[in-house]
């Protein structure tokens, strides 16, 4: 029975905490929890524990918060727990080879894509950004490479035209624990069937940046609409008006050709703010000026119509 496995859990954000909660709710034997050190947060910069630490302490589990797992004394913390397997979900620290080899069944990771597509830091966002029809989670055996280990289990889900990174995150946070629990049972039973990743299908999910999220009107309307969903809730697509950043929460594509230069405002009315792009027209529907709440294009036009005069160009 998989419940008899001695499991170390390593993770940090809410996504990881949901996996730990699922393990505990299904009766698995978690013998120790590793998570990142408390970080300053909020205006007061008060030290705040990670969601994983909060849950682990609520459940009375031993918690370890090393800054790194490279020092010998920190690796000994792992060794002393005599785990059968280490489950790693968005931990945020590199596991050295020595640590990867400590548990009897090695270390397994829950990754937010259908590997080998979107190895790396931002798989959820990049799947939206690229216009993928589906994504999912992969449970893999960890090795020293970046998401290069053998795949143990996959679950997929469709990406809808309304999905943002936020909604997709929630979907994968439901799928991941299901896949993890199934994989642990297979490891315990000896029925797991590792599958080598096809190197010809590898793509990399590079980190996001605030600068990348600035709207580039030379791109197509379809690409920009995907970017707006991919970068929501972070870093949020934005444009600059009168030296102020204005976030864009929602937009749609108008499939009409235009000869206007990219960035040219074509219309500004209750249907939205229509802007020419490198290919097609992007209709801005929901925006957020600096220091304000998100609002409809109509509400923004009521107070800032001078920002969106047809014929003017957005930078």
From Swiss-Prot:
Q: Is Lyase one of the keywords?
A: no
Record's keyword terms, sorted: Protein biosynthesis, Transferase
What is a single cellular component term in the Gene Ontology annotation?
cytosol
Q: Which residues bind (6S)-5,6,7,8-tetrahydrofolate?
A: 113-116
Q: Which family does it belong to?
A: Belongs to the Fmt family.
Tell me which EC number(s) this protein carries. 2.1.2.9
User: NCBIfam families from the entry?
Assistant: fmt
Protein species of origin:
Shigella boydii serotype 18 (strain CDC 3083-94 / BS512)
A GO molecular function assigned to this protein is: methionyl-tRNA formyltransferase activity
Q: Which reaction does it catalyse?
A: L-methionyl-tRNA(fMet) + (6R)-10-formyltetrahydrofolate = N-formyl-L-methionyl-tRNA(fMet) + (6S)-5,6,7,8-tetrahydrofolate + H(+)
Asked whether the UniProt record includes Protein biosynthesis among its keywords, one would answer yes
The protein's matches in Pfam families, at most eight in alphabetical order, are given as: Formyl_trans_C (PF02911), Formyl_trans_N (PF00551)
**Residue stretches in coiled coil:** none
Query: Which purpose does this protein serve, as stated in its record?
Result: Attaches a formyl group to the free amino group of methionyl-tRNA(fMet). The formyl group appears to play a dual role in the initiator identity of N-formylmethionyl-tRNA by promoting its recognition by IF2 and preventing the misappropriation of this tRNA by the elongation apparatus.
**What is the official name of this protein in its record?**
Methionyl-tRNA formyltransferase
Tell me which PROSITE patterns the record gives. GART
């Amino acid at each position: 029975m998989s419940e008899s496995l001695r499991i170390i859990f390593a993770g940090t954000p809410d996504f990881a905490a949901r996996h730990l909660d699922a393990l505990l709710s299904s009766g698995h034997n978690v013998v120790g929890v590793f998570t990142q050190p408390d970080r300053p947060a909020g205006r007061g910069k008060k030290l705040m524990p990670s969601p994983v630490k909060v849950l682990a302490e609520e459940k009375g589990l031993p918690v370890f918060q090393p800054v790194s797992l490279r020092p010998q004394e920190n690796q000994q913390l792992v060794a002393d727990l005599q785990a059968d397997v280490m489950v790693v979900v968005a931990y945020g620290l590199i596991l050295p080879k020595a640590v990867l080899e400590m548990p009897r069944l090695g270390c397994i990771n829950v990754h937010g894509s259908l590997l080998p597509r979107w190895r790396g830091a931002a798989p959820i966002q990049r799947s939206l950004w690229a216009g993928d029809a589906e994504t999912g989670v992969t449970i893999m055996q960890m090795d020293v490479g970046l998401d290069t280990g053998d795949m143990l289990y996959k679950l997929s889900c469709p990406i809808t035209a309304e999905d943002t990174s936020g909604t997709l995150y929630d979907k994968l946070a439901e799928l991941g624990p299901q896949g993890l629990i199934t994989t642990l049972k297979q490891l315990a039973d000896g029925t797991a069937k590792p599958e080598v990743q096809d190197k010809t299908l590898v793509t990399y999910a590079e980190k996001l940046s605030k600068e990348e999220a600035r709207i580039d009107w030379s791109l197509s309307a379809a690409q920009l609409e995907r970017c707006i969903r991919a970068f929501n809730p972070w870093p949020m697509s934005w444009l600059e008006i009168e030296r102020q950043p204005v976030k864009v929460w929602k937009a749609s594509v108008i499939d009409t050709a235009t000869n206007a230069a990219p960035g040219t405002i074509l219309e500004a009315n209750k249907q939205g703010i229509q802007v020419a792009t490198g290919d097609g027209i992007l209709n801005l529907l929901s925006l957020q000026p600096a220091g304000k709440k998100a609002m409809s294009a109509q509400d923004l036009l009521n107070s800032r119509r001078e920002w969106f005069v047809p014929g003017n160009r957005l930078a």
